[in-house]
C-alpha cells in the first residue's frame, strides 16, 4: 500500500487471504511505524513500534495475537517509561515494582488467574530473597496448590521449599506442620506423616504447634496399631 504522494504505507505478505510472514508500515513522513510478523492473520513473535519522530515507542513479543513476556514502552524523547511483563495477554506486573506491590498484585490475580498469580509469586521469591515478602510468597504458593488447585503433591513440594529456603521463619513451622498433615490426613500415608511430625518436633521443640503435633502423633499411632 502507498500514500497518495507515492510513499510506501504498508509492506505485507498474505497467505490464503490473511496476513502472513513479515509486516511493516510507515508514517506519511517516511518514518517506520511498526514491524513484526503475522502467522495466518495473527500477530506472532517480536514486534517493534516507533513514534512518528523515529524514536522507539513500544517493543515486545506476541504469542498467538496476545502480548507475552517483557514489553518496554518509550516516551517520544526515547526514554523508557514502563517495563511490563505479560502472560498470554494478561498484564502481570511492572518491572519497576517492589516486593510489596508484586505481592498485592499476586493476591489480586489469585482470584481470576491462579497460574499467573504463581508466576508473580515466583518472581518475588527469586528476585527479593531477603524480603519478608519472599517468605510470604513461597508460603502463599503452597497454599494455592493446597486449597485452590488441590494438587497435594505440589503443595508438599512448595511447603518443603518454605522450610528449606526460610528455616527460621514462622511460616517454616506452619509449612512443616502442613506437610505432615497432608501426608496423614489427605494422602493417608501414615508412615510418612509420622516421620514428618517427628521431624517437626526435632526442628521446632518450642513451637506453639507442639501440642497439636503430639496429639496428631498419638492419634496416628493409635490408628496404625488398630490396622
Set out the residue ranges of the language-model regions:
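Glycine/tyrosine- and acidic-biased, solvent-exposed loop/turn segments at the edges of beta-strands
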Residues: 1-132, 146, 160
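TPR-repeat structural position
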Residues: 114-115, 152, 190
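Terminal, low-structured helical/coil segments at or just beyond the last alpha-helical repeat
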Residues: 99, 108, 188, 194-227
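Specific register positions within alpha-helical solenoid repeats of the TPR/Sel1-like families, i.e.
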Residues: 110-111, 143-146, 180-184, 222
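Short solvent-exposed coil/turn linkers within tandem alpha-helical repeat scaffolds
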Residues: 17, 41, 65, 125-134, ...
Amino acid at each position: 500500500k502507498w500514500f497518495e504522494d507515492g510513499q510506501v504505507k504498508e509492506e505485507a505478505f498474505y497467505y490464503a487471504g490473511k496476513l502472513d510472514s513479515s509486516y511493516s508500515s510507515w508514517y506519511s513522513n517516511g518514518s517506520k511505524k511498526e514491524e513484526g510478523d503475522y502467522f495466518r492473520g495473527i500477530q506472532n513473535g517480536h514486534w517493534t513500534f516507533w513514534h512518528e519522530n523515529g524514536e522507539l515507542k513500544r517493543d515486545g513479543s506476541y504469542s498467538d495475537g496476545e502480548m507475552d513476556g517483557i514489553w518496554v514502552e518509550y516516551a517520544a524523547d526515547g526514554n523508557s517509561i514502563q517495563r511490563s511483563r505479560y502472560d498470554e495477554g494478561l498484564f502481570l506486573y511492572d518491572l519497576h515494582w517492589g516486593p510489596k506491590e508484586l505481592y498485592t498484585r499476586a493476591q489480586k490475580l489469585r482470584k481470576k488467574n491462579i497460574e499467573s498469580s504463581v508466576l508473580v509469586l515466583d518472581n518475588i521469591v527469586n528476585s527479593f530473597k531477603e524480603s519478608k515478602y519472599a517468605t510470604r510468597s513461597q508460603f502463599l504458593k503452597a497454599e494455592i496448590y493446597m486449597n485452590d488447585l488441590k494438587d497435594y503433591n505440589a503443595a508438599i513440594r512448595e511447603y518443603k521449599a518454605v522450610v528449606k529456603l526460610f528455616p527460621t521463619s514462622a511460616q517454616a513451622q506452619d509449612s512443616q506442620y502442613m506437610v505432615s498433615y497432608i501426608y496423614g490426613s489427605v494422602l493417608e500415608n501414615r508412615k510418612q506423616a509420622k516421620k514428618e511430625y517427628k521431624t517437626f518436633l526435632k526442628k521446632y521443640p518450642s513451637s506453639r504447634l507442639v501440642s497439636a503435633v503430639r496429639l496428631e502423633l498419638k492419634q496416628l499411632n493409635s490408628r496404625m496399631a488398630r490396622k
